[in-house]
């Protein structure tokens, strides 16, 4: 990957565009501290804004080589080389001993004659290094600092809270490292670093294509920030292994394949509205440049060394027009188009616009004139400014046919989207003089790419700006702050649910797994990743968690929750959840029968023994004698009737299965929810035969299904343990 110099206003890049240079790069020194601080001051960075990848090229040192104590300067041929005196070097061990006041291990004896004591090294014996046994103090275990402390058992409630507090939407990536956020086509991370440094590692790539991006970024980056100078097509997005969100900083998203990103589950973010005023100001500036030919006058004056006479000024002014009374046509009267029209009215321009999506009365409120056909719009405009969205209907809307309908000598201004103009047709119209001038801030072709034949290269009367209409120092900083905050939301929260500026949020949620897009309130342990145990988070997220396997923290009661943990759709359907719970309790009942009790296998050494005592409401209550977490499942008040109705139909004599009658036991909004989600959840539901279930539970023919107790504790909770439900 090419290396870029981090010195301000130095644009040198190694192997840039295939060119080679004999410059080399130096890292920012870490020690001594005074030298590091002087380096950071020279390049305008601080400890918070500096990144580890930053390098300084050798052109900022006298003679092209860095010497000891040198500070980089902008230009050594003009600026005097700065050099400081460094403090004496200290080894790591001596520095550590000095800070901790630890004496040297082998102090060197001073010679009586003052000579070097090197002669005494050969005469030293074993006793010189170790004190005599008589002077060695007796060993007292009570005072020994190495006495092992008694083991402290972890608080079971704290252990359970550690599991439940782990984020359910930690983005995919290596569990042993922090998330990686990459700035693809830039190198200044001074604004983003303070916002993201505590949750992610920020790296800059300064790449013009994905071929220049380091493999580590492609494999580990979960979020990306980008400007306009790099394009992400489908094949580019597929190179990123774990990318979840891309934020486009600036105006427009033409350089991102949003459709491909949606198919890959990548959220595309863009913050509109922060640059409306800036784009409108730049657009009006380009319009005035075309009318008054200011750009060509300035260019002629800067390129000519002799005095410019009246004849040359008159020659440069060919094609200029009076601003007042001219007609400005705005194609797309949205926020930017409206802002441009209001500014242009102050200069005496008559404003017309064509936008079939604007409500009636919008023109009267603004003082504009509305036209209802594209032909009338093109034929009446002296200058056309494009401010519409890019889509299938608007792509190439300025082409050879539409340009033929324009007045001769019309001006074209585009600060919106590059695909709105057919550049080949515009180049032909500029060369034959039908279009007197054009100002383009966005380009469909790469202007300086030698492998791309740009039709606009060499065209007369054209102003090209590098997608800078939105750029001001204040607006750029605001956009970067919003982008960093959005990336922080994606890392700490739910992606894309919590994103404010995601333009494909609904599509990503609709195309993704239905379980993943509804993790907000269904189940606290849903959608957590664990390398060996499904639906559990990595243990590195909770360093003080004492168990290598989270199941051990919950004891044997965790076995009763397995139906919920193994099937992510169960928390969304009370009927399916209760069916699986009944099946699990049936297995426990069969193991607890007198016939099988004598042949039960010995319990696992990790299983917590518990004493059983009857509960208050007909269910069995367990009181653990060893530290173990008590697992309780909350039952919402409005779901009680649904579960009881399902149990009644499950044990009914007609033998209907629970799956076929689940919808009839749910009322109101819950029934509609099941119907809308039926295609998603019915695949995961297990159809239970009622007769077979009654045989396994040893339940005879019941006239009143209410005799089966489901262990409702005060109408709010169900305590789940190893014992079968009371019948």
Swiss-Prot record:
Entry keyword set? DNA-binding, Metal-binding, NAD, Repressor, Transcription, Transcription regulation, Zinc, Zinc-finger
UniProt keyword Ribosomal protein present: no
Q: Where is the composition biased (Basic and acidic residues)?
A: 77-94
Choose any GO biological process term that the UniProt entry carries and state it.
negative regulation of transcription by RNA polymerase II
Q: Which SUPFAM superfamilies match?
A: Formate/glycerate dehydrogenase catalytic domain-like, Glucocorticoid receptor-like (DNA-binding domain), NAD(P)-binding Rossmann-fold domains
> Known PROSITE patterns for this protein?
D_2_HYDROXYACID_DH_1 (PS00065), ZF_THAP (PS50950)
Q: From the UniProt record, which GO molecular function terms apply? A: DNA binding; DNA-binding transcription factor binding; NAD binding; oxidoreductase activity, acting on the CH-OH group of donors, NAD or NADP as acceptor; RNA polymerase II-specific DNA-binding transcription factor binding; transcription coactivator activity; transcription coregulator binding; transcription corepressor activity
One Pfam family in the UniProt entry: 2-Hacid_dh
Low complexity bias locations: 587-613
Q: Point out which parts of the chain are THAP-type zinc fingers, as ranges.
A: 5-60
What is this protein's function?
A: Binds DNA and represses gene expression. Plays a role in regulation of life span, possibly by regulating transcription of genes important for lipid metabolism.
What the entry says about domains is:
The THAP-type zinc finger mediates DNA-binding but is not required for repression of gene expression.
Q: Please report which protein family the annotation says this sequence is part of.
A: Belongs to the D-isomer specific 2-hydroxyacid dehydrogenase family.
Q: What is this protein called?
A: C-terminal-binding protein 1
What lineage, starting at the top, does this entry show? Eukaryota, Metazoa, Ecdysozoa, Nematoda, Chromadorea
